[in-house]
Amino acid sequence: MDRAQKEKVVEELGQIFESSGVVVVAHYAGITVAQMQDLRAQMREVGGSVRVAKNRLAKIALAGKPSEKMGDLLTGMTVMAYSEDPVAAAKVADAYAKKNDKFVILGGAMGDTILDPAGVKTVAAMPSREELIAQIVSCIGAPASNIAGAIGAPASNIAGILSTLEEREAA
């Protein structure tokens, strides 16, 4: 790789580190090409990506960024999984690590917070943005549906009583 290509890679990595909600770093020694393609496909499904880059270039790209300390994780054969959604890449990486013992999560970064492997698992256990929105909407909508049910209950009770009275008179 010549100098211009290296500069381009450093620039791309810098953009990844700045724009990603989470970056997960893992060792991938011993993983086959097919397994790596499977990981990439799973990441794409959730809007994330996987990148293998030279550790030295990644450390240069991290210089001056809030997640600069993540450079300590970049040793050996490392892969970076990232996504704009702070939970998506962590969920996929954690699930993949459970299925494949050769994929070992080293840690990651979420903004300026450096995550250890347990931190990545904690982030992976969190609900996604869409799930959180759904929970909030259901919490907001629950009182309204309860009120509507309470208002509608007397009318349905009266209708039930009237139908029972009609049945008694008919019998």
From Swiss-Prot:
Pfam families: Ribosomal_L10 (PF00466). Signal peptide: none annotated. GO terms for cellular component: large ribosomal subunit. GO terms for biological process: translation. InterPro entries: Ribosomal_uL10 (IPR001790), Ribosomal_uL10-like_sf (IPR043141), Ribosomal_uL10_bac (IPR022973), Ribosomal_uL10_bac_type (IPR047865), Ribosomal_uL10_CS_bac (IPR002363). Keywords: Ribonucleoprotein, Ribosomal protein, RNA-binding, rRNA-binding. The keyword rRNA processing does not apply. One of its GO terms (molecular function) is large ribosomal subunit rRNA binding. Transmembrane segments: none annotated. Belongs to the universal ribosomal protein uL10 family. Part of the ribosomal stalk of the 50S ribosomal subunit. The N-terminus interacts with L11 and the large rRNA to form the base of the stalk. The C-terminus forms an elongated spine to which L12 dimers bind in a sequential fashion forming a multimeric L10(L12)X complex. Forms part of the ribosomal stalk, playing a central role in the interaction of the ribosome with GTP-bound translation factors. This is Large ribosomal subunit protein uL10. The gene is rplJ.
